[in-house]
Amino acid sequence: MLKPLGDRVVIELVQAEEKTASGIVLPETAKEKPQEGKVIAVGTGRVLENGERVALEVAAGDLIIFSKYAGTEVKYEGTDYLILRESDILAIIG
């Protein structure tokens, strides 16, 4: 399993819609880059200048919305993941 360091988070992307609301099938080139994902793992937190560690606000299992071009895409054991910093997370869904 991937274990992120510091204030990083590993997420599994929620797949983009295959069709529009009116039923038109979208080709790969027309799909929006996904901005939603499920948190798979979280790092130990951010370290302040005084050495104190601050825990992350998100937890494994949370559904999140993140910045459009944030993070680094990685493939691990055949699954695509995104590793990003907690500051790139915009909201927790639900």
UniProtKB/Swiss-Prot annotation:
One of its GO terms (biological process) is chaperone cofactor-dependent protein refolding. PROSITE patterns: CHAPERONINS_CPN10. It is found in: Cytoplasm. GO terms for molecular function: ATP binding; metal ion binding; protein folding chaperone; protein-folding chaperone binding; unfolded protein binding. Keywords: Chaperone, Cytoplasm. Its main location: cytoplasm. This is Co-chaperonin GroES. The lineage of its organism: Bacteria, Bacillati, Bacillota, Bacilli, Bacillales.
